[in-house]
């Protein structure tokens, strides 16, 4: 499953939810119509809902969920993440990756295993991989100057600059 967006607010009087897209690609949301998605809160609470309408207006995205017909019903869902099945995830271009799928990949250099990706985070428009090496943790910028080949079959990520692990 992939996170596709976050509920920001209610919209209108018919129970639409205003959504922030994680990928900024609204077109892929059209495929959610008549499909079930999982709404998850950071505390672990989750509910499954069916998307019955997708609306894009003025660079904003709105979803209507089955059984939610008033703004008051949307308000408790604000902040929930919208998770979708892998088959409904946005398509990727060459060289693009779902960061969540990189968790568990092994960091390598010259075929030597160095550590494992345990998390990622974004800060000031940059993505960092959190890498565990022994009992220490390091943050590696997800930039081509530091990161080389990513092998999905072997689940490895080449680290070009070893000094990042000191």
From Swiss-Prot:
UniProt protein name: Ribosome maturation factor RimM
UniProt keyword terms in alphabetical order: Chaperone, Cytoplasm, Ribosome biogenesis, rRNA processing
GO BP annotations listed: ribosomal small subunit biogenesis; rRNA processing
GO MF terms, alphabetically ordered: ribosome binding
UniProt free text on domains: The PRC barrel domain binds ribosomal protein uS19.
InterPro entries xrefs: PRC_barrel-like_sf, PRC_RimM, RimM, RimM_N, RimM_N_sf, Transl_B-barrel_sf
Localization per record: Cytoplasm
Record's subunit section: Binds ribosomal protein uS19.
HAMAP family, sorted: Ribosome_mat_RimM
Function field: An accessory protein needed during the final step in the assembly of 30S ribosomal subunit, possibly for assembly of the head region. Essential for efficient processing of 16S rRNA. May be needed both before and after RbfA during the maturation of 16S rRNA. It has affinity for free ribosomal 30S subunits but not for 70S ribosomes.
Gene Ontology cellular component annotations, sorted alphabetically: cytoplasm; ribosome
Recorded family membership: Belongs to the RimM family.
Domain of life: Bacteria
Native source organism of the sequence: Borreliella afzelii (strain PKo) (Borrelia afzelii)
Residue ranges of domain PRC barrel in the record: 94-165
């Amino acid at each position: 499953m992939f996170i596709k967006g976050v509920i920001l607010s209610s919209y209108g009087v018919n129970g639409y939810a205003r959504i922030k897209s994680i990928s900024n690609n609204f077109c892929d949301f059209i495929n959610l119509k008549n499909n079930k998605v999982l709404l998850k809160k950071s505390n672990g609470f989750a509910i499954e809902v069916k998307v019955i309408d997708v609306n894009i207006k003025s660079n904003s995205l709105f979803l209507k969920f089955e059984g939610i017909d008033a703004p008051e019903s949307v308000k408790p869902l604000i902040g929930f993440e919208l998770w979708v099945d892998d088959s409904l995830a946005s398509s990727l271009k060459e060289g693009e990756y779902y960061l969540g799928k990189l968790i568990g990949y092994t960091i390598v250099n010259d075929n030597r295993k160095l550590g494992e990706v345990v998390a990622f985070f974004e800060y000031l428009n940059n993505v960092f991989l959190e890498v565990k090496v022994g009992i220490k943790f390091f943050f590696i910028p997800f930039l081509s100057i530091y990161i080389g080949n990513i092998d999905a079959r072997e689940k490895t990520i080449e680290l070009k600059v070893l000094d990042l692990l000191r």
